[in-house]
Curated annotation (Swiss-Prot):
Cofactor notes: Binds 1 pyruvoyl group covalently per subunit.
GO MF annotations, alphabetized: adenosylmethionine decarboxylase activity
S-adenosyl-L-methionine in keyword set: yes
Organism of derivation: Nitrosococcus oceani (strain ATCC 19707 / BCRC 17464 / JCM 30415 / NCIMB 11848 / C-107)
Name this polypeptide is given: S-adenosylmethionine decarboxylase proenzyme
Site positions per UniProt: Cleavage (non-hydrolytic): 116-117
Active site: 117, 122, 145
């Protein structure tokens, strides 16, 4: 059961640092060298620095932050990154915020008290040289020094970056004092990151939690339940392939998803023979 938190009267500034690390993976099968190159080019365009800046700007709006500075870069031959420095919103006194353990907006305006916090995103496209599998990873970090948790932006991020696999880590560090001098090492209720995710999203994903409550560390990973081969073929259609080839490709893609989800190599007879 989630422990309820009463409003804490603080002595001075809220010194808690709350960090959300959000990693998404997109997987596809591109059979030829040309298709693999086109996939990388597509991902590079779809997730260029301009679009990533827009996503982080929306995140800043959701958590009620002012953007102080933006640094962004597209890389050769591939990849992009954006870093934002954010600070507290001056309109804070006119708006309300909440740390309720519930899904965040898509998006809607919230306000928090921030000081020298930051948002970052980096992308990592790659492809296997032989077996046709190509993957794309985006890492987003939202770190706030203040009252509103970056988990308020989680729902927006999931819907903005529709992905095959999502890995999330949330931690709270430091402490803040109440007016009597007592320390508070967390200032909001949480027993799972899943409670901040919309029900329709949870219904579409397999989800696993690994939490260390006494250390204020929360980990959730998600993998899509439904599998349609056409969704994973780049530059081709399943109907153009023989049934045996469809099955072989599906096995490769599913194996790739499982390995990423569980974070380890999983033996598969056909795939192992191609690795040797």
């Amino acid at each position: 059961m989630t422990r309820a938190f009463n409003k804490i009267k603080l002595h001075g500034f809220n010194n808690l640092t709350k960090t959300l690390s959000f990693n998404v993976y997109d997987i596809c099968y591109a059979q030829t060298f040309q298709q693999r190159r086109e996939y990388i080019e597509y991902i590079d365009e779809e997730y260029n620095a301009e679009r990533l800046t827009h996503i982080l700007t929306e995140v800043a709006e959701i958590i009620g932050a002012n953007i102080l500075n933006v640094a962004r870069q597209n890389y050769e031959p591939q990849g992009a990154s954006v870093t934002m420095l954010i600070a507290e919103d001056e309109t804070e006194i006119h708006q309300q915020f909440t740390n309720a353990e519930e899904p965040g907006p898509l998006p809607e305006s919230l306000v928090c008290h921030l000081d020298k916090s930051h948002l970052t995103v980096h992308t990592y496209p790659e492809s296997h040289p032989e077996n046709g599998i190509s993957t794309f990873r985006a890492d987003i970090d939202v770190s706030t020094c203040g009252r509103v948790s970056p988990l308020r932006a989680l729902n927006y991020l999931i819907h903005s970056l529709e992905s095959d696999i999502v890995t999330m880590d949330y931690r709270v560090r430091g402490f803040t004092r109440n007016v009597y001098g007592g320390k508070h090492f967390i200032d909001h209720a949480i027993n799972s990151i899943q409670n901040f995710i919309a029900e329709d999203t949870k219904g579409r994903y397999h989800m696993i939690d690994v939490n260390i409550y006494q250390e204020n560390i929360f980990h959730t990973k998600m993998m899509l339940k439904d599998f349609e081969l056409d969704d994973y073929l780049f530059g081709g259609n399943a109907c153009d392939l023989a049934s045996q080839e469809q099955q072989a490709i599906a096995d490769r893609v599913k194996n790739e998803m499982l390995e990423i989800f569980y974070g380890k190599n999983i033996p598969h007879p056909d795939i192992e023979s191609s690795r040797r």
